[in-house]
Design a protein with these regions (language model features):
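Long, non-catalytic terminal segments
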Residues: 2-126
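Histidine-centered divalent metal-coordination motifs
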Residues: 64, 129-133, 140
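Short acidic/polar capping segments at secondary-structure boundaries
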Residues: 80, 132-135
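Non-catalytic alpha-helical scaffold/packing segments enriched in small hydrophobic residues
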Residues: 116, 136-137
Length: 147
């Protein structure tokens, strides 16, 4: 043990009021306003994935359930790098795999994974899947990894 005198620090100083803690859920006037806000966040999410290295090739996708058309979801197009995705690139896809808004091709793997997820879990509004170089390297190891 050290002979240093403990500091008297008020750890409650500067705390946020309870109402400002945690996630802040926004309220929107209509579904179109909510959609635009969430699509901007979705596009930003792709850029964050790129920034943090979850951008290996074209493997990976993030989806967002449409607030008005609950059986549709927004997804990134095939072949557009995460660092370049903007709201105008995003595709609205129905559960049959048809692109109902957007002019690019949908990633078949993204549709296969996310359509099942969104169907099975109506309480889930967004999902992400990526192939990081670290995760990919683990699948190429010939012997099992140890805990």
């Amino acid at each position: 043990m050290s002979n240093v005198s403990p500091l008297k620090i008020d750890i409650t100083d500067g705390r946020l009021p309870v109402k400002e803690k945690g996630l802040v859920f926004q309220e929107f006037a209509n579904p179109a306003e909510e959609r635009r806000n969430q699509l901007e966040k979705l596009a930003a999410g792709f850029r964050l994935f790129d920034y943090f290295g979850f951008n290996e090739g074209v493997a990976g996708h993030i989806t967002y359930r449409d607030p008005e058309f609950k059986d549709h979801f927004w997804v990134n197009p095939l072949g557009v790098h995460f660092s370049q995705i903007s709201v105008s690139d995003l595709l609205l896809v129905n559960h049959d795999g048809k692109v109902v808004q957007g002019d690019k091709d949908v990633n078949v793997a993204a549709f296969a994974i996310h359509s099942r997820l969104h169907k099975a879990r109506p309480d889930v509004n967004a999902a992400a899947h990526s192939h990081s170089i670290y995760g990919l390297s683990l699948i190429h190891i010939s012997e099992p990894t140890r805990p």
